[in-house]
C-alpha cells in the first residue's frame, strides 16, 4: 500500500492503542519495494525519451557532450534490468533500446557534426518540408505556429553552428566532397529568395479559418518578420559561406575512407545502417551476387508522363492501391498522406520522397513528387515503395501504436523501413497493380537499384572506385541517364552506407517470408505474416529475425 502519510498509518495501525503519540523507540520505515522489472524498464525508456528527444540536428559541442553522457548513463541503467524476468514484448523493448544506445555511444567516436551539409535530406530541406506540412494542416492551432517560430530560431542557431563546425572541419581535414557542396548551393539560393513562392511562406497563405483575427494578425506579423529577418538571411549566409570559403577547400574525392579514421567510420556506418557486423567486402559480394541474380530486365519503353500532370497521376493511382490493400493486410493506418510537387527539392533518381507526418497524422505525411527539369513517367513501383504499402504504411502504423514506448513509436530503423519499402514493391503483382510489362520492368528496376547500391557504395567508400567507375557501373546495370547517375553518386558520397538499407532489409523480409511459408505450409497466412512483421514497429534486422522465428514456432 502506498500514498499514505505517517499520520494516516498511525491512525490505521495504532487505533487500538491509548493514543497516537510517538513511540519511545523510533521504528524505521520499511524499505521501498523495488519496481518490477517491466515497470523498471518502462520508467527508464520513458525517462530517456523525456530527457533526450531525437534532436539529431543539434550539432554544438555542448549538446554532443551532454548527449554522450546521457546515452552512457541510460546504458548503465539498462544493465540493471533483469532481462530474463521480462515478458516477450518488454524483451523486445530491452533489446531494441540497448542496441540503439550502444550504436549511439560508438557513434560519438566519429565527427559527423563536421559534415553537416546534405543536398538530399539536409536541415534546410527538412525545415522547408515542415513548413509545407504546417501549411496543409487544416487543424493547426496558434500553438503550432508559435512552435514553428521557435523552430526558425533553432534553425538559425543550427546554421551558425554548422558554419563553425565546417571551419573546424577545414582545420582538421574533414570536408565534404566538392560536388556535394556544388549541389547544395542552388538549394540554399532558392530557399534564400524573399518571394511568395518560397516554401517558408506557405504557412502564411493557408491559416485555418478557426484562428481568430487577432491571433492571425499577430502570427502573420511575427512569421513574416522571422522569415524575412532571420531565416532567409541565415540561408543566404550559409550559401555565401559555402560558395566563398568552403567550396575552394572541399575535398576532390568522394570516399569516406579518404578522411581521418575513414575506414573505421565506414565500418561503423555499415553497422548502424544494417544492424549486423558485416564488412564492406561482405556487402560488396552480396551486391555483386544480387546484381547477377537479377540480370538485365527486359527493356520496355517507360509510360509517358501523364497528360493531367504527374502529381495528379499519383493521386489517381492511390485509389486502386487503397482498394487492393485489404487482400494482403489485416490492419491499415488510419492516417492518410498527401501527394504534392516539390520544385525546391533536388532531383534524385527515385523522383519520390516521403516525409513522415506527426502523431495521428497531424501534420500530415507527404509524398513529394520531384519532376525535375525533364518529363518523368509515372512509377507504380515507386509509389508502392514510398507510399502504400511501403514506407507510409509501415511508419504510420508504428506511430499509431500508442502502446509502444515512445522511442519505438517515433524512432527509426533504416534497414527495416527502407527494406519494407522494397518488399512492398514485390507485392504489386499480387495486388493486381502491374498491368503491363512496362510496370513490371519498373518494379524489377527498383530492386536492381537497391542491389547496385551495395556495389557502388562499397566501391566508392572501401574499394577505391573513381567517380567514373561508379558512373559506368550505374549506366551498365541501371541504364540511367547522366543526371540521374551523377545524382546517385553524390547521394552515396553524402550518406555512406545508407543506401545499403534498401537491399539488405528487403532481402531479410523475403527470406523471413520464404522461411515462414516453408515451415507453416498450408497454415501460412500472408495477412497474419504482415501483421506480425509490422505490429511491433521498426527494429534491427537480427532482432526482427529472432522475433519472427519465435512467432513461426508458436504458429506451427
Q: How does the language model describe each region?
A:
Residues 20-556:
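N-terminal maturation segment of proteins
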Residues 8-19:
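Bacterial N-terminal signal peptides
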Amino acid at each position: 500500500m502506498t500514498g499514505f502519510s505517517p499520520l494516516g498509518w498511525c491512525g490505521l495501525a495504532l487505533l487500538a492503542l491509548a493514543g497516537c503519540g510517538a513511540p519511545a523507540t523510533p521504528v524505521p520505515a520499511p524499505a521501498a519495494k523495488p519496481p518490477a522489472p517491466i515497470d523498471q524498464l518502462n520508467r527508464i525508456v520513458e525517462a530517456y525519451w523525456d530527457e533526450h528527444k531525437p534532436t539529431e540536428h543539434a550539432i554544438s559541442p555542448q549538446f554532443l557532450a551532454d548527449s554522450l553522457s546521457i546515452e552512457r548513463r541510460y546504458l548503465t541503467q539498462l544493465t540493471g534490468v533483469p532481462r530474463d524476468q521480462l515478458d516477450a514484448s518488454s524483451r523486445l523493448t530491452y533489446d531494441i533500446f540497448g542496441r540503439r544506445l550502444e550504436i549511439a555511444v560508438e557513434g560519438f567516436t566519429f565527427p559527423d557534426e563536421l559534415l553537416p551539409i546534405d543536398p538530399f535530406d539536409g536541415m534546410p530541406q527538412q525545415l522547408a518540408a515542415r513548413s509545407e506540412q504546417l501549411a496543409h494542416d487544416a487543424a493547426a492551432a496558434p500553438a503550432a505556429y508559435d512552435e514553428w517560430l521557435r523552430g526558425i530560431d533553432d534553425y538559425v542557431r543550427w546554421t551558425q553552428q554548422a558554419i563553425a563546425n565546417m571551419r573546424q572541419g577545414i582545420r582538421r581535414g574533414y570536408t565534404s566532397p566538392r560536388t556535394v557542396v556544388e549541389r547544395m548551393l542552388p538549394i540554399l539560393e532558392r530557399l534564400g529568395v524573399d518571394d511568395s513562392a518560397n516554401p517558408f511562406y506557405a504557412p502564411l497563405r493557408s491559416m485555418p479559418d478557426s484562428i481568430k483575427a487577432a491571433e492571425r494578425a499577430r502570427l502573420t506579423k511575427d512569421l513574416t518578420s522571422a522569415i524575412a529577418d532571420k531565416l532567409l538571411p541565415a540561408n543566404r549566409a550559409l550559401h555565401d559561406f559555402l560558395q566563398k570559403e568552403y567550396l575552394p577547400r572541399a575535398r576532390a574525392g568522394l570516399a569516406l575512407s579518404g578522411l581521418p579514421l575513414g575506414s573505421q567510420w565506414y565500418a561503423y556506418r555499415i553497422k548502424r545502417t544494417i544492424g549486423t557486423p558485416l564488412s564492406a567486402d561482405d556487402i560488396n559480394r552480396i551486391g555483386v551476387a544480387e546484381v547477377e541474380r537479377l540480370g538485365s530486365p527486359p527493356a520496355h519503353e517507360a509510360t509517358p508522363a501523364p497528360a493531367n500532370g504527374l502529381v495528379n497521376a499519383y493521386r489517381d493511382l492511390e485509389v486502386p492501391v487503397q482498394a487492393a490493400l485489404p487482400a494482403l493486410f489485416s490492419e491499415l493506418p488510419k492516417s492518410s498522406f498527401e501527394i504534392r510537387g516539390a520544385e525546391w527539392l533536388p532531383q534524385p533518381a527515385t523522383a519520390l520522397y516521403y516525409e513522415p507526418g506527426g502523431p495521428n497524422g497531424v501534420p500530415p505525411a507527404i509524398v513529394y513528387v520531384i519532376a525535375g527539369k525533364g518529363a518523368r513517367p509515372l512509377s507504380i513501383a515507386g509509389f508502392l515503395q514510398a507510399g502504400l504499402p511501403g514506407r507510409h504504411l509501415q511508419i504510420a502504423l508504428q506511430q499509431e501504436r500508442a502502446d509502444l514506448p515512445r522511442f519505438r513509436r517515433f524512432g527509426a530503423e533504416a534497414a527495416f523501413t527502407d527494406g519494407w519499402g522494397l518488399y512492398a514493391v514485390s507485392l504489386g503483382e499480387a495486388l493486381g497493380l502491374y498491368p503491363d510489362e512496362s510496370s513490371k520492368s519498373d518494379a524489377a528496376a527498383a530492386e536492381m537499384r537497391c542491389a547496385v547500391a551495395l556495389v557502388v557504395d562499397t566501391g566508392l567508400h572501401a574499394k577505391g572506385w573513381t567517380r567514373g567507375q561508379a558512373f559506368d557501373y550505374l549506366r551498365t546495370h541501371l541504364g540511367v541517364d547522366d543526371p540521374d547517375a551523377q545524382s546517385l553518386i553524390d547521394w552515396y558520397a553524402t550518406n555512406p552506407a545508407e543506401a545499403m538499407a534498401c537491399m539488405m532489409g528487403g532481402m531479410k523480409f523475403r527470406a523471413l517470408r520464404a522461411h515462414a511459408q516453408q515451415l507453416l505450409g498450408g497454415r501460412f497466412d500472408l495477412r497474419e505474416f504482415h501483421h506480425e512483421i509490422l505490429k511491433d514497429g521498426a527494429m534491427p534486422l537480427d532482432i526482427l529475425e529472432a522475433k519472427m522465428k519465435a512467432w513461426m514456432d508458436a504458429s506451427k
